[in-house]
Structure formats: structure tokens, C-alpha cells
UniProtKB/Swiss-Prot annotation:
Essential for respiratory growth and required for mitochondrial protein synthesis. Required for vacuolar acidification. Its main location: mitochondrion. It comes from the Eukaryota. This is Required for respiratory growth protein 1, mitochondrial. Keywords: Mitochondrion. GO terms for cellular component: matrix side of mitochondrial inner membrane. Belongs to the RRG1 family. One of its GO terms (biological process) is mitochondrial tRNA 5'-end processing. It is found in: Mitochondrion.
Amino acid sequence: MTSHFSSLPAHRSYIFSLYRDVLRNIHRCCYSVELQNILTSKLNLTMKQQKGTMSSWKAHSKIKELEELNDRLINRDLPYLKELINNLSGNKINSTQPNQYVQDLKEATNLINEYHSNNSQSIETIKKMDILNRYIKTKQSKHLLPKEISNVYKESLLLPFAIHEDSIYKLNKLHNQLIRGPPRVRLTNTKAGKITIWFLRSALNKKDRQSKKLKLRIAKEKQKHQQRIDNIKTCEKYAYWALLEASWESLLNTGKLPTININKTINNLSTLDNEDININRKNNHHIKDIHVKEWIEPITYSIKQLVDKEFERKCHYENYKKIILYGKNNGLIDFFENKTKVMYARRVSRYKTVVNGLPFIIPTIPRRDLRTALLDNKVLLP
């Protein structure tokens, strides 16, 4: 029998990653809130509709559309988004009865597109203008520049010095980071109830470089823990009614009510401490009333299984910390420390290369300025 795409880990991982990227880029690259809402709702509707798709060709085409949408969002290709609003769900909007909401969106899109076509600037130019504006404001606040400056002087005279000063600031910032030594590798954790999930933090796996598997593992562990808590609460509710039924059955058969404290029994069953559970297991054998024992044993068994699973996961992460993270020769900690030292040595080498070339830096000559030296030596990202 043909397996569904959801049973393929590689497919699931890629789709989830791409889906998150598209959602992130919709809010990052679209300045219109209405456009964000339409794209988000259409995307969620399409993902829901195509969830049960078994056709490989159809799944392939939809993935390509999603990849194209992501690329268009990154490039801010606003005219294309108008067509993709219809294509994502596969349902064309009836042109004979156009939606007023869509018409307003088209007009807004045309205005935005017209504005960008008349005021198109590269990202590099925008960055340089931002540096220049900050430089001028700083100098004017110190009364080192006049309030009115010609645009010709700004671009031809002040811009090279603004970029040079900004590059010096970034070089000094890097120097302050390097004198502190290699970045630390530290052991940290997060909690899921009494389960302590241990993992490593270093300069190599922080922010965007953090392992997606680690995120999924933590989220899944917390979700499973909450499910066990909810199941135990459900067992408590059933235990209350089971004890009442057992008391009633015992009264019918023997004419006497069993001497049992319902609230105390439920509290003993629902505790999450494994040592207490072991004590309660011994106490459960002392329940003399056969009717109470018959009614309460299935619920007791279910709660024991849930608590044992909780304790098992707790031990699993403790062993993971001892064997994998520390382990022989410090395990993963030693591995990340070595990798971090190699990365630090490369950064020091690049920094020294830039510093050795400082006597030859001329801010006003293209390709001889400090910013170019930082970019060429990969000290500064473009």
C-alpha cells in the first residue's frame, strides 16, 4: 500500500521548515497588514487542503509554488503576489463579481509598485545612506557640521568618512570581542515538569544556527509531559466516580460502607513523585474491600504507567547528560569547545590581516577603504 508523504521524515521536515520561512517572510517583507492577512490565510487554507494529497506530481507542484512564493517575498516582488493570492488555494476569484477587498488591495499594490519604481535603490545604497545620516546627526549634535548641507557634499565628501568611521567602530567592536577569548561552551537546560532537558549552547549553534531537531525535541517533550498531566487529571476524575461506584456496590452486597477516604486515596494516586508512588504501590495491596480493589485497580495501573513514563524520560535526559554531553573525554562539550577554538583562531587571523593593512587604508579611494578591507577578509558580512 502506498505510504502517505507525512510518513517520510525528510518530507515533513522540509515542508515544516519551508512553511515557517514563508510565514516569517510574509510579516518581514510585506508592509501592508491586509496583504499579510490575505497571504497568511490563503497559505494556511492551502496547507490544510493539500494535507491529504497522495499525488506526487501535485505535491511537487505545490511545493514549487511555495518555494516561488518564498523567493518572491524575499525579493519583494509585489506585483507577483497579486497573482499568487489566487494560485495558492487553486480557486480563481470570479472576475465578473470582483471582491471590493481585492480591488482595494490591487490599487494599493499598484501604488506601492509605482512608488518603488520611482524610488528604487539597492540595499547597499540604503545601508550607506543610513550610515551617512547617523554620521551627520552625530556631528551636528556636537556642532561639528552645519545644519544645512548640500547633497553633493554629502555624497562626495561626507559619505566616505561616514563609512570609514562606521567601519572603525565595527573593527573596535570585534577587537573587544576577541580580547575576551574564545566564546564559552556552556551546558544549559529547560524544564518539562520534573524532566530536565539538557543541551549545549555555543557560538556555533545559537540563534538561526540552532538545531531544528533540538527545537522539535523540546517542544515534543513538553507536549508529551502536558498530555501525561492531563491524562492523570482524567484518571483522578474517573477514580472519584469509581470509588463511589465501589462504595455503592459494597453497600448492596455487604450492607456496610467501606472505610475509605476518597480524597486521600485520589491524592495518593495522582502524586507525580516516583518514590511516593512506590510507597503507594505497597499501600494499595492493603485495600481489603474486594469491590473497591476491583474498581480502583485499572485506574491505579493507568496512573502508574503514566508516572513510570515520566520517570523514564527524566532518567533518559540525566543519562544523556552524563554519557553524551560529558561522556568520555567530555563528549560533545569537548567537541564544541574545539570547534569554537578553531573558529576563534580564524577570526583572530582575519582581524590581524585587517589591522596589518590599516596603514594602506585611504577612505576616499574606492576599493582602498576600510569597509572593503573588512568585507574582503570576511570580518564584516555584506
